[in-house]
């Protein structure tokens, strides 16, 4: 049981912290408030990517018309369903119109409570760090009553703004290896990234799903982090991580994806079975995290760039596949299931790889009847014309998605 005064203490601590702390730079993607009269805005993303800060920025704008409650506060760890009544009383006493509910998905039956508050005409913005919990519970009780928003670590432009830098090959390379986690960008202490990695594994996966084979899960996560941009299949990595059951690996990969630590991109195929059994490509949530947890001498810079391009595309597109025919195209962007854009990634085009990169992209252009494509590089500009169409070569730091 949680006392009313405990809720008041948590609310006051949140208010004071937001009033005194640096709430950082504005994000490129604002919270979609235009539909908030009847819908809850649900901000999801990996831990420490800036969800709470984004909520704090909104709180500052709203001032006294809002309540900010951090449900991961230690004083609220024993929250039960019976505590909702006292929480309601506290909210009513404050006369708030906006409820900013940070990490509310850890509460029992939270989605029922949010639905009730929507029916009472509160404007609600919530955050969460687990895609599975959010999607399952939102689909049950908040179907048609929520606006989803995914938040990622800082983009290149946000990185530049935070650091007061300008676009250049040098600042791009700095971003490539440091990534976009806000706290790490302020300190440069790689121990923060290692601690974040372990925190996600423990809190979002091991504890939440009751994983017993902790060492094997650690090996899987480390293996994936060190192989971003590569294809993999569960049967082929069983021996490397000392796990016998393919289904166990598949389940763990789903948990890792639900925590936003990794994304898995499937091969484009018009056959559902072919798509399911084909190897997937793995990408980390952040290139700085991947670099910090890899053996630097063995880091493939091209794969790191490919990972960065994937993150940039995911900021704008939800349907992303790869193409694999006689050649390969790294990214096929779809809209309503229809391929609309094609991207190839190559750190540096040279006589040894140029034909392979162009051939793979042109094959995809012909396959999908798309007369244009892009090759994203570190620092090369060019344009190629062929019977398949036009290919623009663009450095990442000049690329405007």
Regions found by a protein language model. Give the residues of each.
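Short regulatory helix/loop adjacent to the ATP-binding pocket of P-loop NTPases
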Residues: 132-147
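Loop/turn-to-beta-strand initiation segments
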Residues: 95-98, 120-125
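Conserved P-loop NTPase "ATPase switch" module shared by AAA+ and STAND
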Residues: 92-110
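A cross-kingdom feature that marks ATP-driven nucleic-acid transaction machinery
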Residues: 2-23, 34-44, 48, 53, ...
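Conserved ATPase-coupling elements of RecA-like P-loop NTPase cores
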Residues: 79, 105-114, 136-137
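Interdomain hinge/linker elements that couple catalytic modules in large macromolecular machines
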Residues: 2-18, 152-311, 315-325
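Structural recognition of the conserved hydrophobic beta-strand(s) that form the central parallel beta-sheet
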Residues: 123-129, 150
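Short glycine-rich substrate-engagement loop in P-loop NTPases that contacts/grips substrate
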Residues: 67-95
């Amino acid at each position: 049981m949680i006392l009313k005064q405990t809720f008041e203490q948590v609310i006051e601590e949140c208010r004071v912290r937001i009033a005194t702390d640096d709430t950082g730079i504005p994000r490129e993607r604002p919270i979609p408030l235009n539909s908030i009269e009847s819908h809850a805005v649900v901000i999801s993303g990996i831990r420490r990517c800036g969800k709470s800060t984004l909520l704090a920025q909104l709180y500052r704008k709203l001032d006294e018309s809002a309540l900010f409650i951090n449900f991961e506060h230690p004083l609220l760890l024993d929250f039960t369903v019976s505590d909702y009544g006292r929480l309601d009383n506290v909210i009513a006493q404050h006369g708030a119109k906006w409820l900013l509910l940070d990490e509310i998905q850890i509460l029992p039956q939270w989605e029922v409570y949010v639905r009730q508050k929507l029916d009472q005409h509160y404007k609600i913005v919530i955050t969460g760090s687990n895609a599975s919990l959010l999607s399952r519970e939102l689909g049950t009780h908040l179907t048609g009553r929520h606006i989803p928003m995914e938040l990622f670590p800082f983009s290149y432009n946000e990185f530049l703004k935070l650091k007061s830098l300008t676009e250049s090959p040098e600042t791009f390379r700095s971003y490539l290896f440091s990534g976009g986690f806000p706290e790490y960008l302020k300190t440069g202490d790689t121990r923060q990234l290692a601690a974040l990695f372990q925190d996600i594994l423990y809190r979002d996966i091991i504890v939440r799903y009751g994983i017993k084979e902790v060492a094997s899960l650690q090996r899987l996560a480390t293996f994936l982090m060190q192989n971003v941009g590569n294809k993999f299949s569960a049967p082929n990595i069983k021996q490397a991580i000392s796990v016998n059951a393919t289904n166990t690996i598949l389940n763990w990969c789903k948990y890792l994806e639900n925590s936003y630590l990794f994304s898995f991109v499937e091969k484009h195929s018009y056959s559902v079975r072919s798509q399911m059994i084909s190897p997937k490509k793995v990408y980390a949530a952040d290139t700085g995290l991947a670099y910090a947890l890899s053996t630097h001498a063995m880091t493939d810079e091209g794969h790191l760039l490919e990972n960065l391009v994937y993150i940039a595309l995911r900021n704008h597109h939800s349907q992303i596949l790869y193409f694999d025919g006689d050649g390969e195209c790294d990214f096929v962007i779809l809209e309503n299931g229809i391929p609309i854009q094609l991207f190839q990634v190559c750190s540096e085009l040279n006589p040894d790889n140029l034909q392979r990169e162009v051939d793979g992209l042109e094959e995809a252009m012909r396959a999908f009847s798309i007369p244009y494509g892009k090759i994203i590089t570190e620092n090369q500009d060019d344009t190629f014309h062929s019977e398949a169409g036009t290919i623009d070569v663009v450095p990442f730091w000049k690329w405007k998605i």
